[in-house]
Structure formats: C-alpha cells, structure tokens
Amino acid sequence: MKLLFVAEHFPPEIGGVASSAARISQAISRLGHSVDVFVLARDLPSGAAESTLLSPTVALHRMGMARNLDFTLQQSLIFLEWLHNQRRFDAIWGHYIAHAGFLATWFGVHQRIPVTLAARGNDIDRELFPPGDFGRLEWCLRKCQRIVAVSRVLASKIETLVDREAIVLPNSVDAERFSPGPRDETLRSQLGIEASDAVLGFSGELRAKKGLPFLVQALRETHQRQPTRLLLIGEVRQQDRGEYERATADPAIKERIILTGHIADADLVAQHMRQVDAMLFPSLWEGMPNSLLEAMACGVPVIASDAGAIPEVLTDRVSGLVVPRTHLHQMAQRVDELFSMPGDTRVGLSEAARNVVLREHSPSVELTRLKAILEALPESVRS
C-alpha cells in the first residue's frame, strides 16, 4: 500500500505530535507499506518544497508556509495533487485534526482515497473553543473513513461530537532506551546538583498548558523544607517565555532551576531523568504525554495531574501519584507524601509504572494495533 501521511508537525520540529508522527510513519513502513510524509515548514520560503528520503520506504516532503493560512492550504493541495500523480496513493493518514487533518480529509474526499484521522488531544480541545474552527473539525470527523484517538477519554469526546466510534491507539515508548539506571555523579556535578539536593523534574516543551506555575510553586514550597532543585529537561516554548520569566522572577527560586534546553538525544534525556527524585507533570490538559511514559519506563517516581489520558496510564498510589487538576496548588503536598514513603514503597510505585509501559505501551504493542487499523481500511471504505 502507498500511504500519504499528512502531519501537523514532524522532526526536526520538537514536541509530542512531531515525535509521534515520526514514530507512527516509520511503524507503518515496517508493516510493509511505503509512506510519503507531507508537512508544512516555517523555515522554507512560501511554496518552496524539499523532499528527503528518510528510509527506503519513507519520504519526507516539506513545503514552506505562506503568510496567510488560506493561501498555504491551497498551495498544499496543489502540491499534494502533483505528488498523488507521481505516487498514486491508496490511503491517507491525517496526523492531528486541525490543518493536517483538514488537508488530508479534503484531498481524500476529492481524490476518492480512504482517510484515517488521528486525534492527538490538543487538536480536539483547541478546535472546540473559539478561535478554533468547530465546523471544520466536525466536517473532518464526519467525512473521514476511520478515526484513531490516542486515548479512551479522547475517543469518548469524539463520540460525543459526531456519534462515531474512534479506535484507541495509545502512544508507545522504547523501554530499552528509557530504562532504570544508576545516578551519574559526573552529570549531576555538571548540572550543579549537590549531594544534599532533592531533585524535582519535568521533561518536554514547557508552556502554560503543562502547568508551568505549579512546577515553580512546588519547587518553592518543597525548598522551604529541604534543599531542592527543579530540573527542566527541555526548553520553554517561545511564546511562553514571558510567563516563565514572571513565574521565576524571584532570584532565590530561579537559581534553583536548571533549564537544559532541547536535548535531541533520547539516551541523554533518559540519563537526565535518572538524576531526578520525582518527575512532575501538572498539566492542565493533555493527550497522552510521551514524557510521562518515558519517566515511567525509567523507573522514576511520577506525580501528575488527571488531565487527558494520564489516569489511563497512572493509578494513584499504585504506579504513581495523581493530583486532580482542581488541586494542582497541592503538588508540593504530594511531593512530601512521596518523599515520606518508605524506600520499598517508592520502589514498588516505580516498578508498577514501568510494568504498565512494558505491558501496554511498547512499540510491539503499538505495531500490532496499527496493523489491525490499516488492515480494516478497505472494509471501512466499502461500507
């Protein structure tokens, strides 16, 4: 099968949508299909396109965005028509139901090619509310042949919106790469972590929806009781820089924060996670965060909100600690609870969390689910 994969984001862009697009497109190719990925690029001139062969069966096509969204989408459709004339696609996958999902659906409807739309979480939440385009969201969900959702809670939202079933395809993580390991004293010294420091951590692209103020509040309150540092593994999104500066305006707090910047090497991300005593994910809304699964796979104790799919992977006091989104100001209290637990209890939480990843979120499990979705496509088109 020749599949057109229309992605909202794709590496070298960072973030969960980009990484999942790369992972799933490669997985489709491993199932024996050829994949052409199309993504809009902000670093290319308007309408300029470049194509790269990522593997023998995966090609990446990037096209520069125009200043106006409507012109960008029309340019994209012209490029996709040209690409289809070259490749003759059998199926289309739209990864993220916003611009990518609309392009995939519109093109598929007009070319009579079956379309699968993959909802990632933030796409549904954003389009539901102004200035999101609810009408376009609803049209896409009704016109595509198959809907895939990253979580059960997201599938339920889709069913409420359009009374259609969505197949759940959770995220996966490489648990061999993200695995428990010893502390690295050299790295801790390079980061400025002292032996007496408790280390709270966060991984990913830090922004408002990830609960930035609650991370800083947890650091402030925990540091009042014991020396504490906050290790931010990643970078702050550009448009949230102002909020970050306001939240860390206190010099006494800012000096306790270690901001690594973006780390492209997954092995190095895992190495940083292993230096942390508790990973915090105080998200306000979510899909299924990759960083949460990575921390669980590393065997690092996790404290997270109940946003999105988090309760589907993390059970309070069984595989971690869960804080209701209405009580994120109490993150530090849950940190205290974790730190006061006996060592074997904390180990039990970490082992249970890693077992969840091994059982439900391994690449092999994702591949099996993906295979079933793709094999069912012809039947869904006939109906």
Regions found by a protein language model. Name each.
Residues P301-A304, L314:
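Short hydrophobic beta-strand element within catalytic cores of glycosyltransferases
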Residues D316-R317, L321-L328, E337-G343:
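Conserved acidic donor-binding segment of nucleotide-sugar-dependent glycosyltransferases
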Residues H262, A270-V276:
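Short alpha-helical donor nucleotide-sugar binding micro-motif in glycosyltransferases
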Residues V153, S172:
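Carbohydrate-associated surface elements
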Residues L4, E194-K210, V216-R220, L231-I233:
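Conserved donor-binding/catalytic core segment of Leloir-type glycosyltransferases
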Residues L284:
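Aromatic "clamp/platform" in nucleotide-sugar-dependent glycosyltransferases that forms part
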Residues A41-L44, V173, S203, R229-E243, ...:
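Glycosyltransferase donor-sugar binding loop
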Residues E243-I263:
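Nucleotide-activated donor-binding/catalytic signature segment of Leloir-type glycosyltransferases, i.e.
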